[in-house]
């Protein structure tokens, strides 16, 4: 089926996944609040990432670094001088655009070139394309453009009681630097030998020129990043390892392979610190978008921090007796973007035999579903006994309890929020201590002893 963002955004708001930020005051451009179901979904995504990339990995450990860091961190990393996007304004609409994305949107939508990438083009090359193609502002319909110029993405604030340059600090634009500055702390305290990785989940902030597409590109966002350190010369082998590992993680959580692709950056597109980068992209309703960047950052970051701090980041290899600065592979995933991908991929409208109405169902992997099951008493007269099942199961799983409306409408509501199993407590349950368990995807129903529910759910929602 063809999916569109408007339908998915509407469902997200209607069912409590995502709300517009500051809604009662007219909102704030491109800010979003995760509702009761959205926070459960996103937390489950983060839990699944941490489980596979940290807890179950023989290589990796986790940290939680501060959002506010010494400004020298950003001087060393190059963010203060180089963390820029190409900005262009339309003189008639007064709207500001990111020039490379303006070109990419035009080429993909108007020319049908889904693989066109403007990242890596010079300002002159981008302006030439805009002029030659006659690209116009979507709002004003005119091609009355300013010149392209750099726009720094760092959010600046002040620490302390006086707002002057000596107290100037920045909201971090990525979580990676918190890992690099803690490299030696972690390596020594955990007695780690190469190869090993350090991962974290946390908020980052970028003053994006043209955020948009719901929670895909926002100014406040959450990252799930791993910095994996290895011996120089082994980085491409490890990059390939993490490409495969990350792709499999997505597939295991029910992302359709047809909606995924791996795209290698060409030489012009590579960041200044990288000798190889691959993006895992997802086909959203609005087009292909990056989910996961898997970059070989070489020894750039550790060397830069060594130069600026005076700290020695050389690793003494106990096997070869060599000393060298480790290379780093960075699989960087946006928690909000991948949550949106799971929302889009799970959404389906399907016909129901014997009914003229389609049912909307979210086919989440059970490990990601906000609720693992819903307990539904067939009648409110049965609620007192049915709530005991809720109390029993909710100590181990996220469980919904719903006693209002007909059982059919309750099934549809649970389908629409992605609950894998509905547990119906009926009048026979009072006598035989069994319940009817309905499967979300197949809609098949089986009778099951109440005593077996916990084991059943544990097996079904495992990841």
Curated annotation (Swiss-Prot):
UniProt keyword annotation of Phosphoprotein present: no
Gene3D superfamilies documented for this protein: 3.30.40.230, Anticodon-binding domain (3.40.50.800), Bira Bifunctional Protein, Domain 2 (3.30.930.10)
GO molecular function terms noted in the UniProt entry: ATP binding; catalytic activity, acting on a protein; glycine-tRNA ligase activity; protein dimerization activity; transferase activity
Binding residues for ATP: 206-208, 216-221, 290-291, 334-337
Biological process per Gene Ontology, one example term: glycyl-tRNA aminoacylation
Chief site of localization: cytoplasm
Record-linked CDD domains: GlyRS-like_core, GlyRS_anticodon
Localisation per UniProt entry: Cytoplasm
Annotated catalysed reactions: tRNA(Gly) + glycine + ATP = glycyl-tRNA(Gly) + AMP + diphosphate
InterPro entries, per the entry: aa-tRNA-synt_IIb (IPR002314), aa-tRNA-synth_II (IPR006195), aa-tRNA-synth_II/BPL/LPL (IPR045864), Anticodon-bd (IPR004154), Anticodon-bd_dom_sf (IPR036621), Gly-tRNA_synthase/POLG2 (IPR027031), Gly_tRNA_ligase_bac (IPR022961), GlyRS-like_core (IPR033731)
Keyword Magnesium found: no
One Pfam family in the UniProt entry: tRNA-synt_2b
Binding positions for substrate per the UniProt entry: 98, 174, 221-225, 330-334
Family: Belongs to the class-II aminoacyl-tRNA synthetase family.
The name this protein goes by in its record: Glycine--tRNA ligase
Organism: Staphylococcus haemolyticus (strain JCSC1435)
Lineage, opening ranks: Bacteria, Bacillati, Bacillota, Bacilli, Bacillales
Gene assigned in the entry: glyQS
